[in-house]
Amino acid sequence: MEGSLELSSEAILRFLAERGGRAGHSELVQHFRDVLGGQREQRTRARERFKELVNAVATVRTDPADGTKYVHLKKRFCTGDSPPLEAKLPREPPRIEVTEEPQVPDLAAEPCEGSQLQEANPQLSLGLGGEVSDQEPPAPAQGGAQGKDSPPQEVEAVSWASGPGSSENLKLPPQGEAEGGSSPSGPNTPRSARQNFRDLVLGSSPQLKRSVGPGDGNAGGRSRGGGDSDTASLASSSAEEESSVGASVTLDPLDHAWMLSASEGKWDSLEGLLTCEPGLLSKRDFITGFTCLHWAAKHGRQELLAMLVNFATKHQLPVNINAKSSGGYTALHLAAMHGHVEVVKLLVGAYDADVDIRDYSGRKASQYLSESIAEEIKNLVGALDEDDGDSPAARGGGRWRLSKVLPSHITHKLSPVVEDGAELHHHVPEGWTGGSKAKDSGRKASGSSSGRMKPRLNKIRFRTQIIHTTPSFRDAKPTLEEGEEEEEEEEERSLRGYSSSFKLRPKSNVFG
């Protein structure tokens, strides 16, 4: 046998087929040692020829366990498990399919336990002169032989360039098909190359997983083994993101046009929109909370403000001149901020805007007026009243107002009203000493200055004489008559809850 051994692809195929499509590298070299010998140049050419033949029909892989090299027969030259070559040669010529489109190589690795030599077809010629550039699948698994009733498998033959864009595929019917005449289909049926390529792309791109329909995603999940949960979670998360993005509120075109026209203060466009939808007059800006009145006051356009109010009056629409924005500002606040005096006059004088409304920072419109504003404007807005309230007399440097000194439930004990500047002679009990005499001189001096305290007809200050009782002041021990003891007890009961407020109050020229 060794004498007739020749170095050819048929011999290598036969050797690998007899050993189940897999043999050790050293065993293969040892088998063809006789034809690889000779002179140096002859031996070199023989080795190169041997490498080309082996690469054409098989691949060399290294076992990661022990590092041993094995030669595996290529998938196109083997089927599931077959008897030796002589017993398995087909009696009938195989069917050949010629397709114009090149076939995508099958990406799923098929087990290769046996082999079947395809040299019976005279039309199929093996070109073994060049190297094979096809990428081979990973090493096949070693296992038991398959049964005779195994499903049909498609064997792909080597494609040669017999013509542009043409390829030849060799199909060999298995033994079960020849006997039964039918090809059963089962879960072990090889998958199409298109489906394998699709699964590979989907496995490497999670974005494509999300776009796959429910039916398509199941097939890909089965091939990956347990990837259905990951795909479902990715699909649910992407659905939540899309729903959150799509749930953003879209502004109505009419509201959008109204917001732009109101912010620009154009009456021509505002009139047309109001005619179409009168309810826009009280429409608030969803960002600042401004109405068209706020925008007109902010821009200082008193004519636009008057037109808007006249339109509301003409069409009997409710309009609130004191409406607040998101920051609590009224139209009067905005006009005072930007120093629009004419708008302030129109709002307060013509439309009776409330000057005592405070914004959310606690400030009135008069507190936004600049120092350069005329006195009559400040008086119109109420700034002079604020200055009078902040004067030293109001802060406690002068005479006190009764509303700030005494509770309201004891005002029935007040004496008759007197004019400002009148001197009151108070009866001070004998033996009474004030708590802070050092401040009396300063308080009296401030009260004696007539220039600082001017009488106002609309604000009359009430003066009275406070009766200092003995129990209210611990350090006061006056000698009282027996007839006044009952009155003192009544005063004590009425002022018992307020003794702490009177205990430390200093004497003044008003109360003694």
From Swiss-Prot:
ANK repeat placement: 288-317, 327-357
Comp. bias intervals (Basic residues): 453-462
Origin species: Mus musculus (Mouse)
Compositional bias (Low complexity): 173-186, 229-248
PROSITE patterns per the UniProt record, alphabetical: ANK_REP_REGION, ANK_REPEAT
Extent of the signal sequence: none
Acidic residues composition bias: residue spans: 481-492
Location of Omega-N-methylarginine modifications: R395
Database matches in Gene3D superfamilies: Ankyrin repeat-containing domain
Similarity remark: Belongs to the SOWAH family.
Region (Disordered), start-end ranges: 126-248, 427-500
Name of this chain's protein: Ankyrin repeat domain-containing protein SOWAHC
Keywords annotated in UniProt: ANK repeat, Methylation, Phosphoprotein, Repeat
Comp. bias regions, Gly residues: 214-228
Modified positions (Phosphoserine) in chain numbering: S82, S125, S205
